Amino acid sequence: MPTLRIAVRKFDPFESAIRRQFADFARAVDHGAGLELEVLELNDLHRRLFEQRGLADGSLDITFLSTDWLAEAQAAGLIDDLTPRLARAPIADFPQAWSPSLLELQSFAGGFWGLPYHDGPACLIYRTDLLAEAALAVPRTWAEFHAAARRLHAPRLGRHGTALALFPDGHNSFYDFCIQVWSRGGDPFGDGARPRLCSPAAAEALEFLRALAADDAAVAPGAPELDSVKLGLLFCEGKVALMTNWFGFAALGERWRESRVKGRIAVAPIPRGTGYGGRSVSLNVFWVLALAAGSRQKELAWSFMRHAATAPMDKLTTLEGAIGVRRSTWSDPDVNRLIPFFHELEVLHEHARQLPVHPRLADIARVIDDLLAKATATSLPVESLLREAQERVERIVA
C-alpha cells in the first residue's frame, strides 16, 4: 500500500486539517494509500527540507512551505513546477477563485511552485471589550499603539498590554522589522533583495522596536522566547490586550476550545508611522503545499493536492482553525457566523506588501534576527547596527 508522506509545520490546525482532508480524499478516491505526517517546528522543518534534503531524497512527497522559502527551494531544485500538472489535471475555477496576491509569490522563474493552503496577512488584533472599557480608539499610529498598550497593561490581573515575538527563527523579527520600515514610508530592500537599511525610516523603526521591547509597563516579558504561535496563544488565553500578528490567531481566538476571548476580538489595519510617508501596510506571507522533487509517487501527491484545494476542503481548513485561501471561504456565511471578521481578509490583502524573492532570503532573515537581538539587548547606536546589517546583507546578495 502506498503511503503519502507530508512534512507539516507544527500547528495543531494544520495537522488536524490535513488528516481530515486526506480522510475525505481516501473516501472519494479508492487508492488504498496511507498517510504519514512529519510534524516539525519551524527551524526543524527548514533543516529537514533543505540541509537534510528531504525534498530530494524520496522521503517526502509534499511539504508545507512558507512563501519566503520558495525561491530557495526552487533554486536548489527541491520542488516541482506545478504548471504542467495544472495543464494536464487542472483545479476547478483556478486561478479566479483566489486573490491575485495569493498566487504572485509562487510565480517566478517561469514556473508556479506551490498551491496556497493557509493565509494570514499580518494585522492589528485587539480586545474590543478592553478598548471600550478604557474609552480607547483603535490605534492608527505606532505612537497610539504604544500608548494603548501602556494603558491596558495590568500584570496584577494576569494581562499585558502587548507582546513582541523576538524568537530568532528567521521570521518574527524579520517580519516585524520590515513592517515597521514600510509603515514609515521606507523600503528595507530593493531589487534583487539589495539592502536599504541605512535610511531614516529603518533607524526610526529600529528605535521604536528597541523602546517598545524595553518598556515593561507595556510589554510582556520573555520576548526572545516568543514566536508568533506562542504570542498568538497568549492573546487567545486573555494574557495580551492587543498585538500585531497573523490574522489566523484572531480566528483561532474565536474557534479554539480553550480561548478566553471568544466574542471579544476584532482586527484592523496595522498602525502607521506618524511622519511624512507613514502608511498602514500588511505583510503577505503564507503557507503553500509544494510537490517534492524527489517524490516517487507524484501522481498520487498531485491528486491529493488538487483535492485539498477544492472549496469544501478550503472551508475545512478554516473550520479546523487555520485560514482558508479561497474567496468563497472568506465570504462563506457559516464561516463568518463563527468568525465575524473573516470577510475582512479581502480588505487586508489590499494593503499587503511582499518580501523580496531571493534564494538566500533565510540567510538575510537571520541577519535581521541578529539586528533585532542586538538592538533590544544592547545600547549600541542604531546607525552602527544598521550599517553592520547592511554590509552583511550586501555580502549575501553580491
At which residue positions do the language-model features occur?
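Conserved N-terminal structural module of periplasmic/extracytoplasmic solute-binding proteins
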Residues: 1-71, 90, 94, 276, ...
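Short helix-initiation/N-cap motifs at beta->coil->alpha
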Residues: 39-49, 142-147, 221-233
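Hinge/lid segment of periplasmic solute-binding proteins
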Residues: 68-121, 173, 268
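Short, solvent-exposed loop/beta-turn-alpha elements that line the ligand-binding surface or hinge
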Residues: 84-97, 166-168, 184-204, 256-260, ...
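Extracytoplasmic/periplasmic solute-binding protein
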Residues: 108-109, 113-115, 146-195
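Glycine-centered hinge/linker elements that transmit conformational signals in sensory
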Residues: 149-151, 192-223, 270
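Extracytoplasmic/periplasmic substrate-recognition and gating elements
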Residues: 215-217, 255-323
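Long, aromatic- and glycine/proline-rich binding clefts that accommodate carbohydrate-like moieties
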Residues: 268-270, 318-370, 374
